[in-house]
A protein has these predicted regions:
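Hydrophobic residues within well-ordered alpha-helices
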Residues: 1, 44-46, 85, 99
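Bilobed "Venus flytrap"/periplasmic-binding protein-like clamshell domains
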Residues: 1-37, 57-59
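A ligand-binding cleft/hinge motif common to bilobed small-molecule-binding domains
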Residues: 17-21, 44-79
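Short helix-initiation/N-cap motifs at beta->coil->alpha
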Residues: 31-43, 79-81
Length: 134
């Protein structure tokens, strides 16, 4: 990416990663355009105004599907995140344990992959986060 121009959404995690200079995989010689409207990023890429965009992979995939365009997505993600579910600190019903058990069962029996498969190609790759937060 050295010498290239990358568009990111303003106030998003990709913007933070590119502007902070803390990720050794990203050369310092990258021009970053912070764009408020995510849809403008795709137009800028399609028109050649930027060399790349950094955004959530699922958003890029959905844009490509909806607009019948093809972009190349890098194999290595810029960032892997997990989602959390919050319960009231004083909740004594054990909902957190129950939910963890149900999610574990859904993962084991393939239900999670089946649900993700309705929305994403290669759904199994989105379940490869066992060590996240470890």
């Amino acid at each position: 990416l050295a010498g290239k121009t990358v568009a990111v959404q303003s106030t998003g995690k990709p913007e933070e990663i590119f502007l902070s200079g803390s990720d050794p995989r990203i050369p310092q010689a990258v021009d970053v355009f912070s764009i408020e409207d995510r849809s403008v990023q795709y137009a800028m890429l399609a028109c050649g105004y930027v060399d790349a965009i950094a955004a959530h992979e699922t958003a890029i995939l959905q844009y490509m599907k909806d607009n019948f365009v093809e972009f190349r997505i890098l194999e290595e993600p810029l960032l892997v995140t997990g989602l959390g579910i919050a319960f009231a600190k004083n909740d004594s019903r054990g909902l957190d344990s129950q939910l963890n058990a149900v999610l574990a069962q859904m993962r084991t029996d393939g239900t999670l992959e089946q649900i993700l498969g309705r929305y994403l190609e290669h759904a199994s790759q989105y379940l490869e986060v066992d060590t996240l937060g470890a």
